[in-house]
Swiss-Prot record:
Any one GO molecular function term: metal ion binding
Region (Activating region 2B): 123-124
Region (Activating region 3A): 60-61
Cofactor comment text: Binds 1 [4Fe-4S] cluster per subunit.
The UniProt record lists the keyword Glycosyltransferase: no
Record protein name field: Fumarate nitrate reduction regulatory protein
GO cellular component: cytosol
SUPFAM superfamilies in alphabetical order: cAMP-binding domain-like, Winged helix' DNA-binding domain
Subcellular compartments: Cytoplasm
Sequence segments annotated as region (Activating region 1A): 71-75
Length: 250
């Protein structure tokens, strides 16, 4: 029997809410390591919004930090605007990722977050989450793990841009996407790129022409099969080697 409070929350959120206990990506998100009682407490503070359409923003640079956002489905890109007025993409966030950590230090978002496709998110009021984490050691530890993962990702990106050539950058990007899809229960070998080649080039510091040329080269070498936005990894060993990784992706 479903508890009365949970029934009320389902009705208030449109009758179709997926709760933390039932979410297929909870192992990548805040609920991981929490017991049933802690999950219920976390679930009570989460707001589940209607789908975010492609092009819509979760927040803009300069906005006050009010909530963190856990992505349930879809893809969100984060970006800043340079002094010259150009967009600089700083990350692509998939289901299970949390967006907004970089605003905790100052209390204001330093970047924009925009949907690359129709996406679903869970909005988590930060002040309430912060208060709850002070009472729940497991929650606090998981928050620290997630923040640590963000820092590690930033370090990897710095290394990628400073040490690798164009071919290695793109291979590492595809390898990383493959690994992230695998973590979410999707095929690590066949997937669709939700970002444009221009977005990929912007993120990697390469031109659109270079991205297209390299994808063609990867296809000719038998490493990938490319059809529009769809990627099939044909030779995972070669991709891992070019990406500077020792382990296979598929």
């Amino acid at each position: 029997m479903i508890p009365e409070k949970r029934i009320i929350r389902r009705i208030q959120s449109g009758g179709c809410a997926i709760h933390c206990q039932d979410c297929s990506i909870s192992q990548l998100c805040i609920p991981f390591t929490l017991n049933e009682h802690e999950l219920d407490q976390l679930d009570n503070i989460i707001e589940r919004k209607k789908p975010i359409q492609k092009g819509q923003t979760l927040f803009k640079a300069g906005d006050e930090l009010k909530s963190l956002y856990a992505i349930r489905s879809g893809t969100i890109k984060s970006y800043t605007i340079t002094e010259q007025g150009d967009e600089q993409i700083t990350g692509f966030h998939l289901a299970g990722d949390l967006v907004g950590f970089d605003a905790i230090g100052t209390g204001h978002h330093p970047s924009f977050a925009q949907a690359l496709e129709t996406s679903m998110v869970c909005e988590i009021p930060f002040e309430t989450l912060d208060d709850l984490s002070g009472k729940m050691p497991n929650l606090r530890q998981q928050m620290m793990r997630l923040m640590s993962g963000e820092i590690k990702g930033d370090q990897d990106m710095i290394l990628l841009l400073s040490k690798k050539n164009a071919e290695e950058r793109l291979a590492a990007f595809i390898y990383n996407l493959s690994r992230r899809f695998a973590q979410r229960g999707f095929s690590p070998r066949e997937f669709r790129l939700t970002m444009t080649r221009g977005d990929i080039g912007n993120y990697l510091g390469l031109t659109v022409e270079t991205i297209s040329r390299l994808l063609g080269r990867f296809q000719k070498s038998g490493m990938l099969a490319v059809k529009g936005k769809y990627i099939t990894i044909e030779n995972s060993d070669l991709l891992a080697q070019l990406a500077g990784q020792a382990r296979n992706v598929a």
